[in-house]
Swiss-Prot record:
Keywords, alphabetical: Metal-binding, Zinc, Zinc-finger
Domain S1 motif: 135-200
Keyword Protease on entry: no
Full protein name: Uncharacterized protein MJ1198
Annotated GO MF terms: heat shock protein binding; nucleic acid binding; unfolded protein binding; zinc ion binding
Length: 761
């Protein structure tokens, strides 16, 4: 025990000598005064007995000397000493002996006493079956009594059986549930979670607390040795990425950057454990390793939320580890040689890393793509790359269904309707299942100013948005466009001096190969389908077509009907995809789309059969539509050399069936192109009550600088009351306007076409 020093009485100092007082110089007084002079307005009689007096020195209190102090030798100046708890003898000065409780004599007596005692161990909550040693004594509690014996718990995890035959001087009927008892372990089978106890009465013993130190482990190391480490107590630290309340325990999904682990915490069945812990918090967990659905689950023994510098340091380490593992195959050679792709490589690698990082960080991924062949090609390529990574690093066995969504968009831009659905479902999942908010990947849309309202709405919730597009994004200034102020990453050929001929299917496939190079054989033919379906031109497009045909012919020989295909077959696939997309509407078409685009390699025979069926159905509907459209198509040869074709699809085309107005315009345009030649400047305009669809040959763009997006901007300025928007590619896109001003908008559009002049040679 700690007490005041008996020498200095707790002051920590002692008097060593006295010296003359420096204030009074040894007199003991500092001044004389007459009290009478300070008694004004008082009668002389009252002050008669007051004579001159002296004031004692306040420093020496009238003694004329003052003490000189030094540090107390006994207590070392602390004012405290340590006494023996048993005999009261002084052990030494404080704090040198602060940890001592017994003096040397009593300590020696205690050691002699303990030599004749047995150690009885008291387990803490971290001890397991593997910590029990045969022959040693343990203190436990009776938790259950049966005819064949009593069950003794050493802690919540460790329990053994004490049989009547192993009791000395004790009968089973004398035990009650809740009794404390000292038992000896005689047989330990930790792999079976079984212990046999023996009771021997002990009169004198020494209780020893068994405190287990659990070293910090990485989740990856535990997962890789799951069977060997089953039932062992482990210690992890990480970030909570999901919280699910089951009818039993609360299940926390935790990552330390190396892998994921479930941590099950049960207080009361169905009641939320650790309500102070939220998604995104850093926690320290000690628990027992178990296996659930073939994956690591830790049954919590201790779970503590960490805060401050310690939490930030762990968060930083997790971020660094995820960053390292998220690195894509950024230097992988592209499928074709392309200067534009090489200039886009840093942006594509950034997108690939962000997608991989979202998977490793436990964030869901939503892919939004345009509902046409090119959009589906880009979306499917990314899906094929992402799903194996999710499955490999998943935080649950059904993660490919819970953490990945691919959704088509009917509009050629990210609509407010689309983002509203994405937000509602994502917020519901966050509330119901404790998921993080997702990463949204827009492919084959997202680059234009029409996308900004929807993207802004997603960003209001802190959602990361990535754009992979090939549509004209507007004016490019220093490699950036307007939408770049709203998105986290943007891949578009226009940003590096390219054009729309590197389609979304091309970009999606090349990024998918960076994300997961192992899927190349499943998707290498997809860009060829995309460029044909989107009427892309150029050397790169032809290279992709060749790769696609080589791959499809190879698959047909190995898994299919042994056919040999040419470019026309890619056109058939593209038409079938557009045909199926019309009926899929807002469904992702998982499975069917795989077969149409031939990504289900071993079922290539089914792909061939499906294409034959769908193509026949689609062509019947196209021919039916063309019989109505071609006679109504008006062709005008303008003075500037442009061949202008107009069609009222509201009156002369079948509604609410395939092909839709956009595809109908395309087929009508192809009919005119075949008639007059692809090298001619041909523009086809079809229109309905409140929309217009435009298709043009490359010759119009090359000879007349035709760019639909610029014409749309001009119309928006000239006719603001039409509430006009739209756009797309330079030679293909759409217009939207109010129905009452259709004639004015269409008339002005035609007037602009007529006023176009060929470029000077």
């Amino acid at each position: 025990m700690i007490v005041k020093c008996p020498i200095c009485d707790g002051t920590g100092k002692k008097v060593v000598k006295y010296k003359t007082c420096p204030v009074c110089e040894g007199t003991g007084f500092i001044d004389e005064f007459s009290p009478k002079q300070h008694m004004k307005r008082v009668s002389k009689r009252a002050t008669y007995d007051l004579d001159y007096g002296e004031i004692p020195c306040p420093k020496c209190k009238g003694t004329g000397k003052v003490p000189v102090y030094a540090k107390c030798d006994f207590c070392g100046g602390s004012g405290k000493v340590v006494k023996c708890d048993r005999c009261g003898a002084i052990i030494g000065k404080y704090p040198d002996f602060k940890d001592r409780t017994l003096c040397d004599k009593c300590l020696k007596e205690e050691e002699e006493r303990k030599k004749g005692l047995r150690n009885v161990y008291v387990f803490d909550e971290l001890a397991t079956f593997y910590d029990v040693e045969p022959g040693k004594f343990y203190k436990g509690v009776v938790t259950r009594i049966e005819k064949y014996g009593a069950f003794i718990n050493l802690n919540e995890q460790v329990r053994g059986l004490l049989r009547p035959r192993d009791m000395i001087s004790l009968r089973l009927e004398n035990l009650n549930v809740g009794d404390e008892i000292i038992v000896q372990a005689i047989d330990v089978r930790p792999e079976k979670r079984e212990i046999d106890f023996k009771y021997i009465p002990l009169t004198t013993y020494d209780l020893v607390k068994y405190e287990k130190e659990v070293p910090l482990s990485q989740i990856k190391d535990i997962s890789q040795n799951l069977v060997e480490m089953r039932d062992q107590v482990v210690h992890i630290r990480g970030e909570v990425v999901q919280i699910v309340q089951t009818p039993g325990p609360t299940v926390f999904t935790i990552t330390d950057g190396t892998d994921f682990a479930w941590v099950a915490a049960l207080e009361i069945a169905g009641l939320r454990a650790h309500p102070d812990v939220k998604v995104g918090d850093i926690v320290d967990v000690i628990g027992r390793v178990t296996i659930r659905d073939g994956r690591l689950q830790i049954e919590r023994i201790k779970l503590q939320k960490l805060e401050g510098d310690e939490a930030e340091e762990i968060r930083k380490k997790i971020e660094e580890e995820i960053d390292r593992r998220a690195e894509p195959a950024k230097d992988i050679p592209f499928l074709v040689k392309s200067e534009v792709l090489e200039r886009l490589r840093p942006k594509m690698a950034d997108v690939a890393k962000r997608i991989r990082k979202a998977v490793l960080d436990g964030r869901p991924i939503i892919i939004r793509h345009h509902a046409d062949t090119d959009g589906y090609c880009g979306g499917i390529a990314l899906e094929k790359a992402i799903l194996p990574i999710i499955d490999k690093f998943a935080i649950d066995v059904d993660a490919i269904w819970h953490f990945f969504k691919r959704r088509p968009s009917k509009a050629p831009f990210y609509e407010l309707e689309d983002v509203t659905k994405d937000l509602v479902f994502s917020i519901e999942d966050a509330l119901k299942f404790g998921q993080k908010l997702p990463l949204i990947v827009l492919i084959d849309n997202g680059s234009t100013d029409e996308d900004i309202p929807a993207i802004s709405k997603a960003k209001a919730y802190g959602i990361e948005v990535i754009v992979i597009d090939h549509h004209f994004p507007g004016e490019v200034v220093d490699g950036k466009v307007e939408v770049d102020d709203y998105v986290d990453a943007h891949v578009n050929p226009y940003l590096v001096g390219g054009d729309s001929n590197l389609t979304a299917g091309v970009l999606g496939t090349e990024i998918a190969r960076m994300i997961n190079p192992d899927v190349e054989d499943e998707i290498k033919h997809i860009p060829g389908i995309a460029v044909v379906g989107d009427h892309a031109k150029g050397e790169e497009a032809e290279q992709y077509v060749k790769i696609a045909l080589d791959r499809l012919n190879e698959l047909s020989k190995k898994y299919g009907k042994g056919r040999t295909y040419d470019r026309e077959y890619l056109e058939k696939i593209a038409l079938c995809m557009d045909f199926e997309a019309f009926y899929l509407r807002f469904m992702d078409g998982k499975g069917i789309v795989d077969d149409i685009l031939a990504t289900n390699i071993k079922e290539f025979g089914r792909h061939e059969e499906l294409i034959d069926i769908l193509y026949e159905q689609a062509m019947k509907m196209v021919e039916r539509q063309m019989k109505a459209v071609i006679p109504a198509l008006k062709t005008e040869f303008l003075e500037n050399g442009i061949i202008l074709n107009t069609l009222d699809v509201e009156k002369y085309a079948h509604k609410f069936t395939f092909p839709a107005p956009g595809k109908t315009t395309g087929f009508a345009h192809d009919y005119i192109v075949q008639k007059y030649g692809e090298d001619k400047p041909i523009i086809t305009l079809s229109y309905g009550p409140d929309f217009g669809v435009v298709r043009a040959t490359d010759a119009v763009h090359e000879k007349y600088n035709f760019n639909l997006n610029l014409i749309v901007e001009q119309l928006m300025e000239e006719i603001p009351e039409a509430s006009l928007d739209g756009g797309g590619h330079e030679c293909a896109g759409s217009l939207k306007f109010v129905e009452g001003l259709r004639d004015k908008v269409i008339g002005r559009f035609i007037e602009i076409i007529k006023n176009m002049k060929p470029k000077e040679q």
